[in-house]
Regions:
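Core structural elements
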Residues: 158-176
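Amphipathic alpha-helical segments within well-ordered protein domains
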Residues: 171, 182-185
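Small/polar glycine-rich anion-binding or flexible loop at a beta-alpha turn
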Residues: 160-163, 185-190
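Acidic interhelical loop/turn segments
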Residues: 152-158
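Positively charged
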Residues: 1-152, 179, 183, 190-193, ...
Length: 215
C-alpha cells in the first residue's frame, strides 16, 4: 500500500489484550452482530479495518471504554462465512496509526479519524540491524514464560521466519498484560521492540515468571 492510498478514517475493532503488527497475519472469528456489519461494510469497500486495544482505565460518558491512541490497520486477505453465520477472516497488518478523534455515527461499530505520519516506515521493506543471535536470551526467557503459563509455541517454525516476523509474532502471542502489549505496539522500531520485550521479561524473571505488572 502507498501513502496516497491510506484512508483518513477507518472502522475500528477494539479487542482487549490483542495486538497485530505490520507484516503479520492473524485469524479472527467474528460473531457479534455489530462486527459482522463492520466486516460486511469493509468487504464492500477497501477491506481495511483497524485493530486497537480499549483503554479499560478510561471510559466515555456512556460508559464505553475509551481507545488507546495507537493501533494497527490491517487488510482482510481471507473471508469465509460459516453455517452458523460467523465470519472467519484473516487480517494482514499493514501500518500503525494514531487516533485523532472518534467519529459519531449511527453505525453499530466505532469509526475513527486517523493519522499515519509517524508510521510510514511500516510500509517499507528496510531491514534492521538485528541478528538471530541477538534473540537467543529472549527466546530462552520467553520459552520459560510460555511453559509456565501453559502456552504451546512451534519454536522451530518461528525461527524460520524473518526477524521482524519473529519478534512481532512473539509480541502478539506472549502472555503479557494489555499495557505491556501496548508498549510493544508503540515501539518506534523493531530494535526498540526487541529491547522492550527483554525489559518486560526481566521484570517477570524477578518473580519466577509469575509477575503480572510492569512499571
Amino acid at each position: 500500500m502507498k501513502k496516497v492510498d491510506l484512508p483518513k478514517k477507518i472502522a475500528v475493532f477494539p479487542l482487549s489484550n490483542f495486538i497485530i503488527f505490520p507484516k503479520t497475519t492473524v485469524p479472527l472469528n467474528i460473531f457479534e452482530p455489530r462486527y459482522l456489519d463492520m466486516i460486511n461494510d469493509s468487504m464492500k469497500s477497501n477491506k481495511l479495518l483497524g485493530m486497537i486495544q480499549p483503554n479499560l482505565s478510561k471510559h466515555q460518558s456512556n460508559n464505553t471504554p475509551q481507545l488507546h491512541e495507537i493501533g494497527c490497520m490491517g487488510k482482510i486477505t481471507s473471508f469465509k462465512e460459516t453455517d452458523d453465520s460467523r465470519y472467519l477472516i484473516e487480517l494482514k497488518g499493514l501500518i500503525r496509526f494514531k487516533i485523532i478523534s472518534e467519529i459519531q455515527s449511527n453505525k453499530k461499530y466505532r469509526e475513527c479519524e486517523i493519522d499515519f505520519k509517524n508510521f510510514y516506515g511500516d510500509l517499507e521493506n528496510k531491514k534492521e540491524d538485528i541478528k538471530f543471535s541477538d534473540l537467543e536470551l529472549i527466546f530462552k526467557d520467553l520459552k520459560s514464560l510460555f511453559e509456565k503459563r501453559g502456552f504451546i509455541i512451534n519454536w522451530k517454525a518461528l525461527e524460520k521466519q524473518s526477524l521482524d516476523e519473529t519478534i512481532n509474532a512473539l509480541a502478539m502471542a506472549s502472555p503479557f498484560t494489555i499495557e505491556e502489549k501496548q508498549v510493544l505496539l508503540e515501539a518506534e522500531s523493531l530494535n526498540i521492540r526487541k529491547t522492550k520485550i527483554a525489559e518486560i521479561l526481566t521484570t517477570y524473571s524477578f518473580d519466577q515468571y509469575n509477575n503480572t505488572t510492569v512499571q
